A protein has these predicted regions:
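Short, mixed-charge aromatic SLiMs
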Residues: 385-398
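Active-site segment of extracytoplasmic enzymes that catalyze sulfate/phosphate-ester chemistry
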Residues: 60-61
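Flavin (primarily FAD) cofactor-binding/catalytic cores of flavoenzymes
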Residues: 1-54, 67-204, 208-209, 220-228, ...
C-alpha cells in the first residue's frame, strides 16, 4: 500500500521527495491548483500578499539538496519562492505523485492502515493507505480575538490581505506584533489616510541585515558554539547597541528575552514610526462603532482593523481522539511521530525560531527512513520520557505560548541529524521499534 501525504506545500513536497528517495510509494493531496502551499498568491489556503518576502535569509531557508539561485536577493519575494517550490517538484519528479484540487476530508484508522477520504473534481473517494503524513501546515484557520462593544467598522484578518489597495485612503489600525503585522502596517503607512499599530506586548524588532550580512546568519554562526542562553545575551546586547530598545521608538519593551519567541523582522517599521507615518498604540480595550478605545484610555476613529493575530491549529480531518488536548498540544516524538498511532506522522507541525524548509526537510527524512524500515524509533517509554523532557525545557524557555510546538532552529537540525543516525543504528542492530513492528 501507498503512503498518503496531506499537503503539497514545502512540508508535503519535502516529504514526497524523501519517500521517493527511500523507494516508498506515496500519493500527495492538495486543494490548490499548483504546488507551493501558502507561497502561492491566491491559493485556497494561502495567506500570501503582493509585498510578501522571506523573513529568513535565502541561504538559511533553502532545501539542503536544492539550493536557491546564488544571484537571488537575500530575501526573495513570494513569486520566487512559489516558483522555487514548483521547480523543486519538477526537478525531482514529484509532480506526477501529487493530486491537485483534492481535499482530504477524513482520516480514520483501519486495522493496521488508514482510510483516507478525499474530495476531488470527480467526486469523493475513500482509499486505504499504509501510513499518513500530515504536512498541510497550520496557518489556514484565522484567529480573531473578541472585544467588548458593537463594532461597525470593517475588519480583515491578515489571512485575507492581498494588496495595499485594500488599505488605500482609509484610517487603518493593524493589530499584532508578528512579521505579517509589520509588513502590512508598513504597506498601510504608504497608502492609508492614517496608520496605527496596536501591540498588547512588546516584541524584539530585528533588522534584516546586521553588520552587513543577513541577521539570521549571525545567530546561526553562534549556535554552533554556544548555548541559547549565551546567544540570547549576545543578541540582545547587539540589538540594543545597533537598534536601541523598542521603547526608544514608542513601542513596548518585550518582557521575554530574545530567542524566547519567533523574532519579528522589519526594515521599514522603525523608519516609518520615526517619520511620523505610523502611530503606536497599546492593546485594545473595546470597539464601539468606528471608535477603538485602547487600554491607556486613548480613543481613535478607524475605518478598518487588520487583525494580524495568528491562527488556530486546526486539523479537522483527524479524529479528535488522536489529537488529545489539541493539535497544538500534541506530544510527538521529535515533533514527528505520534506516540499512540503507528503510521501517523507529522511534518511541519511546529514553530521554529528560524526558517521552515530545512526543518521540514529533516523531519521528512526521519519519516521516510522509518517507513522504509531503515530507521527504528526508541522504545515507547523512552519516546514518552523524551517528549516530557522536551516539553519541560520548552516551557522553561517559551512559557505557555504553545510550548509543545516550539523548536530552536539550529538545535533541532542538529538533533534530527543525530536522531536519524542513532535510529539507523538501532534498526541495523535489530533494536527499537521498526515500522513493520509498530504497524
Amino acid at each position: 500500500m501507498q503512503v498518503a501525504v496531506i499537503g503539497a506545500g514545502p512540508s508535503g513536497l519535502a516529504t514526497l521527495k524523501a519517500l521517493t528517495d527511500q523507494g516508498v510509494p506515496a500519493r500527495c493531496f492538495d486543494p490548490g491548483d499548483r504546488v507551493g502551499g501558502l507561497w502561492v498568491l491566491g491559493g485556497p489556503h494561502s495567506s500570501a500578499y503582493r509585498t510578501l518576502h522571506l523573513n529568513t535569509s535565502r541561504t538559511r531557508t533553502e532545501f539542503a539538496d536544492y539550493p536557491m539561485p546564488a544571484d537571488w536577493p537575500d530575501y526573495p519575494d513570494h513569486t520566487r519562492i512559489a516558483g522555487y517550490l514548483g521547480d523543486y517538484a519538477e526537478t525531482f519528479g514529484l509532480a506526477d505523485r501529487v493530486s491537485l484540487r483534492h481535499t482530504v476530508e477524513r482520516v480514520v484508522r483501519a486495522g493496521t492502515g488508514w482510510d483516507v477520504t478525499v474530495r476531488g473534481p470527480l467526486g469523493t473517494t475513500t482509499q486505504r493507505y499504509a501510513a499518513v503524513v500530515v504536512a498541510n501546515g497550520h496557518n489556514s484557520t484565522p484567529h480573531v480575538p473578541a472585544y467588548p462593544g458593537t463594532p461597525t467598522l470593517e475588519q480583515l484578518h491578515s489571512h485575507d490581505y492581498r494588496d495595499p489597495a485594500q488599505l488605500a485612503g482609509r484610517r487603518v489600525l493593524v493589530v499584532g506584533g508578528g512579521n505579517s503585522a509589520m509588513d502590512i502596517v508598513v504597506d498601510a503607512s504608504h497608502v492609508a489616510t492614517s496608520t496605527l499599530l496596536s501591540l498588547r506586548r512588546g516584541v524584539w524588532i530585528v533588522p534584516k541585515h546586521l553588520l552587513g550580512r543577513p541577521s539570521d546568519t549571525l545567530n546561526g554562526a553562534l549556535a554552533k558554539r554556544l548555548p541559547w542562553r549565551t546567544r540570547q545575551r549576545i543578541s540582545e546586547t547587539m540589538l540594543k547597541l545597533t537598534v536601541g530598545k523598542p521603547s526608544k521608538y514608542g513601542l513596548p519593551d518585550p518582557t521575554h528575552g530574545f530567542l524566547q519567541d519567533h523574532p519579528t523582522l522589519s526594515d521599514g517599521l522603525l523608519s516609518r514610526i520615526t517619520h511620523g507615518e505610523i502611530g503606536v498604540r497599546p492593546g485594545i480595550e473595546r470597539v464601539d462603532g468606528t471608535t477603538v478605545t485602547m487600554t491607556d484610555g486613548r480613543q481613535d476613529d478607524v475605518d478598518l482593523i487588520v487583525w494580524c493575530t495568528g491562527y488556530r491549529v486546526d486539523l479537522p480531518f483527524l479524529d479528535p481522539a488522536l489529537l488529545g488536548d489539541g493539535a497544538d498540544r500534541l506530544p510527538l516524538y521529535r515533533r514527528v511521530f505520534h506516540l499512540d498511532a503507528p503510521g501517523l506522522t507529522f511534518v511541519g507541525l511546529m514553530q521554529s525560531t528560524g526558517a521552515a524548509l530545512p526543518i521540514v526537510e529533516a523531519q521528512a527524512r526521519l519519516v521516510a527512513a522509518h517507513l522504509a524500515g531503515r530507521y527504528a524509533l526508541p522504545a515507547a517509554d523512552e519516546q514518552r520520557a523524551d517528549c516530557a523532557a522536551q516539553l519541560a525545557a520548552a516551557r522553561d524557555r517559551w512559557g505557555e505560548r504553545r510550548p509543545a510546538m516550539r523548536i530552536d532552529f539550529d538545535a533541532y537540525l542538529a538533533l534530527a541529524a543525530k536522531e536519524l543516525a542513532e535510529g539507523t543504528r538501532r534498526a541495523a542492530a535489530g533494536r527499537g521499534v521498526t515500522w513493520k513492528e509498530s504497524a
